[in-house]
């Protein structure tokens, strides 16, 4: 059995095909979804989604949103997302370095929160392509 997975951002359809299983990051932790999953709606955290298709795993960096699961149909609405094959390693590493520097220089609560979110997004891009953020120092 398979699941119909659709990942949509405001600008484009990022994924629209059958998969065997997914694992997503929610605000309360990671959640695995298999065929005939109970119906629910959940917030999606900034994090890596793992997708199993034809017995192989791939990943996608999700930048927050919502997921609606209805038995064998999953619709994920995200602010932005990038498939692992579309992420440029050097660009992701540079984004991580800049985000880290911004966090160090942040002054005031708002700047710290914004810099922390930017760092989490940058780290997620690296994790989606299996590059350790510590490799980007």
Curated annotation (Swiss-Prot):
Keywords assigned by UniProt, alphabetized: ATP synthesis, CF(1), Chloroplast, Hydrogen ion transport, Ion transport, Membrane, Plastid, Thylakoid, Transport
Subcellular location, principal: plastid
GO CC annotations on file: chloroplast thylakoid membrane; proton-transporting ATP synthase complex
Membrane topology: Peripheral membrane protein
Record-linked InterPro entries: ATP_synth_F1_dsu/esu, ATP_synth_F1_dsu/esu_N, ATP_synth_F1_esu_C, ATPsynth_dsu/esu_N
Single GO term (MF): proton-transporting ATP synthase activity, rotational mechanism
Top-rank taxon, per record: Eukaryota
Record's subcellular location: Plastid, Chloroplast thylakoid membrane
Pfam families: ATP-synt_DE (PF00401), ATP-synt_DE_N (PF02823)
Family matches, as SUPFAM superfamilies: Epsilon subunit of F1F0-ATP synthase N-terminal domain (SSF51344)
NCBIfam families for the chain: ATP_synt_epsi
Protein family membership: Belongs to the ATPase epsilon chain family.
Subunit annotation: F-type ATPases have 2 components, CF(1) - the catalytic core - and CF(0) - the membrane proton channel. CF(1) has five subunits: alpha(3), beta(3), gamma(1), delta(1), epsilon(1). CF(0) has three main subunits: a, b and c.
Purpose: Produces ATP from ADP in the presence of a proton gradient across the membrane.
Name used for this protein in its record: ATP synthase epsilon chain, chloroplastic
Gene giving rise to this polypeptide: atpE
